[in-house]
From Swiss-Prot:
InterPro entries reported in the protein's UniProt record: Ribosomal_bL9, Ribosomal_bL9/RNase_H1_N, Ribosomal_bL9_bac/chp, Ribosomal_bL9_C, Ribosomal_bL9_C_sf, Ribosomal_bL9_N, Ribosomal_bL9_N_sf
Reported function: Binds to the 23S rRNA.
Any single biological process term in GO: translation
Species classification: Bacteria, Pseudomonadati, Pseudomonadota, Alphaproteobacteria, Rickettsiales
Transmembrane regions listed in the UniProt entry: none
Protein's name in the database: Large ribosomal subunit protein bL9
Keyword Mitochondrion belongs to the record: no
Keywords for this protein: Ribonucleoprotein, Ribosomal protein, RNA-binding, rRNA-binding
GO molecular-function terms, A-Z: rRNA binding; structural constituent of ribosome
Biased composition (Basic and acidic residues): 173-184
GO CC terms of this entry: ribonucleoprotein complex; ribosome
Family: Belongs to the bacterial ribosomal protein bL9 family.
Length: 184
């Protein structure tokens, strides 16, 4: 099926390009997400008329993605899963589960935007997940899979302590630089 892209999509092409995709992908993902439209003569003419508006809309989406990316910077998620003694969890962690957790924390991100990097999360531990907020904005977040609420609480406390010490170090470095600048 031939479609016209209404925004830049890294795996397909740029805004306004006519590309061929499988009909199910177009019907079930691209059209409902308003990322593409059918490639008809009428739509091609309409696209040329709307090109500036679409580029402006794309710029707004990019700016919104950058703002969201800054709030997600250094973000981590803790998931509690039942696991065997050797650390294998029962089932696996999915992008839908991660998206649901992000939603509970106030971030409305589609599971389609999450990338596990081709791995399956089936063990306790730390994992890196990429969130594609825009074709030009990809944010990494850290996922911790732990066995119990107690482990999650300990991890949160350790992370908060680590962030406080990093912040104090940064403040000390800034005050030293200011003092050095005053001495010059």
């Amino acid at each position: 099926m031939l479609i016209i892209l209404k925004e830049n999509i890294t795996t397909l092409g740029k805004l306004g390009e006519v590309v061929k995709v499988k009909p199910g992908y177009a019907r079930n993902f691209l059209f409902p997400q308003k990322k593409a439209m059918k490639a008809t003569k009428e739509n091609l003419i309409k696209l040329e008329e709307q090109r500036l508006l679409l580029e402006e809309e794309n710029t707004k989406k990019l700016n919104a993605a950058k703002v969201l990316a800054s709030s997600l910077h250094d973000k981590f998620i803790i998931l509690i899963k039942q696991a065997s003694e050797d650390g294998k969890i029962f089932g696996s962690v999915t992008t839908r589960e991660i998206a649901k957790t992000l939603l509970q924390e106030g971030y409305d991100i589609s599971h389609h935007s999450l990338s596990l990097g081709g791995i399956s999360i089936k063990n306790l531990g730390e994992y890196q997940v990429n969130i594609e907020l825009h074709s030009k904005v990809i944010v990494p977040i850290t996922i911790y899979v732990v066995r119990s609420e107690k482990d999650a609480h300990e991890l949160r406390q350790a992370k908060l302590q680590n962030q406080k010490s990093e912040q104090q170090e940064a403040e000390q470095d800034a005050s030293k630089e200011a003092a050095d600048a005053d001495d010059s």
